[in-house]
Design a protein with these regions (language model features):
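Enriched for short, Lys/Arg-rich terminal
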Residues: 2-4, 22, 52, 60-86
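Short histidine-centered beta-strand/loop micro-motifs
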Residues: 15, 39-42, 50, 61-62, ...
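Arg/Lys-rich, positively charged N-terminal/basic patches that mediate binding to nucleic acids
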Residues: 1-22, 27
Length: 86
Protein backbone atom coordinates (compact mmCIF):
# COMPACT_ATOMS: atom_id res chain seq x y z
CA UNK A 1 0.00 0.00 0.00
CA UNK A 2 0.99 3.59 -0.52
CA UNK A 3 0.74 6.42 2.02
CA UNK A 4 -0.33 9.88 0.94
CA UNK A 5 -0.31 12.89 3.22
CA UNK A 6 -2.53 15.94 3.27
CA UNK A 7 -0.90 19.28 4.14
CA UNK A 8 -1.46 19.21 7.92
CA UNK A 9 0.42 15.96 8.62
CA UNK A 10 3.35 16.99 6.41
CA UNK A 11 3.64 20.35 8.14
CA UNK A 12 3.19 18.82 11.60
CA UNK A 13 5.90 16.20 11.03
CA UNK A 14 8.34 18.91 9.91
CA UNK A 15 7.65 20.86 13.13
CA UNK A 16 8.68 17.95 15.39
CA UNK A 17 12.15 17.21 16.70
CA UNK A 18 14.10 14.64 14.70
CA UNK A 19 13.73 11.79 17.20
CA UNK A 20 9.95 12.14 17.49
CA UNK A 21 9.55 12.60 13.73
CA UNK A 22 11.55 9.42 13.04
CA UNK A 23 9.50 7.40 15.56
CA UNK A 24 6.26 8.59 13.99
CA UNK A 25 7.51 7.85 10.47
CA UNK A 26 8.51 4.32 11.53
CA UNK A 27 5.03 3.71 12.93
CA UNK A 28 3.43 5.21 9.81
CA UNK A 29 5.39 2.74 7.65
CA UNK A 30 3.68 -0.08 9.57
CA UNK A 31 0.37 1.49 8.65
CA UNK A 32 1.02 0.37 5.06
CA UNK A 33 0.46 -3.17 6.35
CA UNK A 34 -2.48 -2.00 8.47
CA UNK A 35 -0.52 -2.80 11.65
CA UNK A 36 -0.72 -0.98 14.96
CA UNK A 37 -3.39 0.24 17.37
CA UNK A 38 -6.04 1.04 14.75
CA UNK A 39 -9.74 1.71 15.37
CA UNK A 40 -12.55 2.68 13.03
CA UNK A 41 -14.06 6.11 13.72
CA UNK A 42 -17.74 5.73 14.55
CA UNK A 43 -20.11 7.26 12.04
CA UNK A 44 -17.36 7.92 9.49
CA UNK A 45 -17.07 5.13 6.93
CA UNK A 46 -13.52 4.60 5.68
CA UNK A 47 -12.01 6.76 8.49
CA UNK A 48 -9.71 5.30 11.12
CA UNK A 49 -7.38 6.46 13.85
CA UNK A 50 -3.98 5.10 14.74
CA UNK A 51 -2.45 5.56 18.20
CA UNK A 52 1.28 6.26 18.16
CA UNK A 53 2.64 7.07 21.61
CA UNK A 54 0.64 10.13 22.72
CA UNK A 55 -0.23 11.09 19.14
CA UNK A 56 -3.31 10.24 17.10
CA UNK A 57 -3.24 9.83 13.33
CA UNK A 58 -6.49 10.24 11.44
CA UNK A 59 -6.49 8.46 8.11
CA UNK A 60 -8.79 7.28 5.38
CA UNK A 61 -8.71 3.94 3.63
CA UNK A 62 -11.27 2.50 1.25
CA UNK A 63 -11.37 -1.29 1.27
CA UNK A 64 -9.70 -2.61 -1.84
CA UNK A 65 -7.78 0.62 -2.46
CA UNK A 66 -3.99 0.65 -2.51
CA UNK A 67 -3.73 4.15 -1.01
CA UNK A 68 -4.05 5.26 2.61
CA UNK A 69 -4.49 9.02 3.03
CA UNK A 70 -3.10 10.47 6.27
CA UNK A 71 -5.44 13.36 7.06
CA UNK A 72 -4.25 14.66 10.41
CA UNK A 73 -1.65 14.06 13.14
CA UNK A 74 -2.31 15.59 16.55
CA UNK A 75 -1.32 15.13 20.19
CA UNK A 76 -3.87 12.97 22.00
CA UNK A 77 -5.60 15.81 23.88
CA UNK A 78 -6.12 17.94 20.79
CA UNK A 79 -7.29 15.03 18.67
CA UNK A 80 -10.28 14.32 20.88
CA UNK A 81 -11.20 17.99 21.39
CA UNK A 82 -11.21 19.30 17.87
CA UNK A 83 -9.78 16.91 15.31
CA UNK A 84 -11.52 16.46 11.96
CA UNK A 85 -12.91 13.08 13.00
CA UNK A 86 -15.82 14.73 14.83
Amino acid sequence: MELRYEKQPEKYLRSLDTTTRNKLKEALEKLKRFEGDIDRIKGKPNRFRLKIYHYRVLFEWIKGAIVITVIEILPRGQAYKGGRHK
